[in-house]
Amino acid sequence: MHYAPHVPTVLDRFIQQAVMQVLQKRWNPTFSQHSYGFRPQRSAHQAVAQAQRYIAQGYGWVIDLDLEKFFDRVNHDKLMGQIAKRVEDKRLLKLIRAFLNAGVMENGLVSPSVEGTPQGGPLSPLLSNLVLDELDRELECRGHRFVRYADDCNIYVRSERAGQRVMESISRFITQKLKLKVNEAKSAVARPQERKFLGFSFTAGPDIRRTIAPKSLERFKQRIREITRTAKGVSIKTIMEELALYMRGWRGYFGFCETPEVLVALTRWVRLRLRAALWRQWKTPRRRRAALVALGVSGELRNMAGSGRGPWHLARSKALSVGLSNAYFKSLGLPSLFDAR
């Protein structure tokens, strides 16, 4: 079977948005205080900060739950049963059922679906929160410290043994009661410092600080590599514009970390990438020398134009540090990941 995402049409989106606004106003106040995803005046940053507070209080083990293909596996009949408890209007129930039954594609033919929520639709996040509200209530009844952002749920306990016990019982609840599946390969009981939550992790020791998870750092670097790869005909202005757009957006989210030294090091790394990229772009010793002259590099330092060393090594050289200085890149619009956050 080939899965085709339930991508709504313009009219579908308009109607879903209208329905969502009405239902969200009614339902949102009833949702758990531990739920942060896709709710007014709530954010991923608030969820991460709450997780940090639990860890600081001595809950040094986390049950990191990953729900397997959550948006694909939501059972329609169960979901409609939950909606019917909150919505009396039969016409509205019929409309929501129609959105859910968008269908999947098999051998070129669309057949009705019995599982999943319409990904990309305005109504989908609200329906997902409704499904997982049952999980929130169960965790609250058991007295657990937990944080949920959409289908990302972390439960904090004081010991590994308690974590294993909770993992087993909650996984059983999710499977039997919610009719969803826990991805055992991606779920774990571990120290919070070993796991990623909404792109962040935490430092070890008595002073718990928010830091950027290794996978998030690697994704950032991979995107910078893609942007700064020298392509024929791509100007430094174009590269800078794309870099600035990406880096400002990234800083807006990950600037919430409490490890400024990481942001400073990343900014330095971006500049090195740019110096290496420009060195490659200049190609020949003659062009490199001319570029260094134009950048105001002094006579002795210009001699490295004929160096046979690699671009990444030369990116650290004094000549490129002077010619392609931090101030030079700033004048071209390159933002810092740390300054003016």
What are these regions (language model features)?
Residues 1-341:
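Non-catalytic terminal/accessory segments
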